[in-house]
Amino acid sequence: MFGGAHELSIDSKGRLAVPAKFRDILSRLYTPAVVVTLESKHKLLMYPVAEWEKVAAQLLNLKVADNPVLRRFQNLLLHNAEILEWDSAGRVLVPAGLRKRVDFDREVVLVGRANRLELWGREQWEAEMVQALDDDPDELAFQLGQTDLQL
C-alpha cells in the first residue's frame, strides 16, 4: 500500500521522477506501470494497472443514463486515462493533455493513498492540509461517528 507525501518537480519536458519507494511497491506488488487520469482541476490520480482495472469496471457499472453529473465524472476519469511506464531514470512522462487541464505546473506533491497515488500542485496540497488541520474536531468526531471506521 502507498503512503507518504513527496515534494517533486515536473521537468521542462513533462517528466516526473517517481520516488524509489513507490516504484519498489509497484514492481513488487503490481507491474512497473501506472494508469494516470484526471480527477479534478487540482489533482491527477495514478493507479497500478490492476487497481485501475477494478476502478474502471466500477465506473462502467455506474447507472449514468439519467444522471449527467455521474456521467461526466465517469467520462472524465475514463476518457483521460493513460498508461505510463517509467524510463531508466525512474521518471514518467505526464501527458501534455493532462498537464494542460490541471491548475498546477511544475511544483507538485506526489501522495500515496492506499491503492493509488495522487499528484497535486504544491499550493493546492498545502491548502488542503491547512483546511484538514483547521477542521472542527467536534464536527469531525460527529461525522466519523456516522461511519463504521475504527481508528
UniProtKB/Swiss-Prot annotation:
Occurrences of domain SpoVT-AbrB (ranges): 5-51, 81-124
Disulfide bridges in this chain: none
Any GO MF annotation of the entry: transcription cis-regulatory region binding
Pfam families associated with the record: MraZ
SUPFAM superfamilies the record matches: AbrB/MazE/MraZ-like
Subcellular location: Cytoplasm, Nucleoid
This protein's record includes keyword Kinase: no
UniProt keyword annotation of Transcription regulation present: yes
Xref: InterPro entries: MraZ, MraZ_C, MraZ_dom, MraZ_N, MraZ_sf, SpoVT-AbrB_dom, SpoVT-AbrB_sf
PANTHER family hit by this protein: TRANSCRIPTIONAL REGULATOR MRAZ
Quaternary data: Forms oligomers.
Record protein name field: Transcriptional regulator MraZ
Taxonomic lineage from the root: Bacteria, Pseudomonadati, Pseudomonadota, Betaproteobacteria, Neisseriales
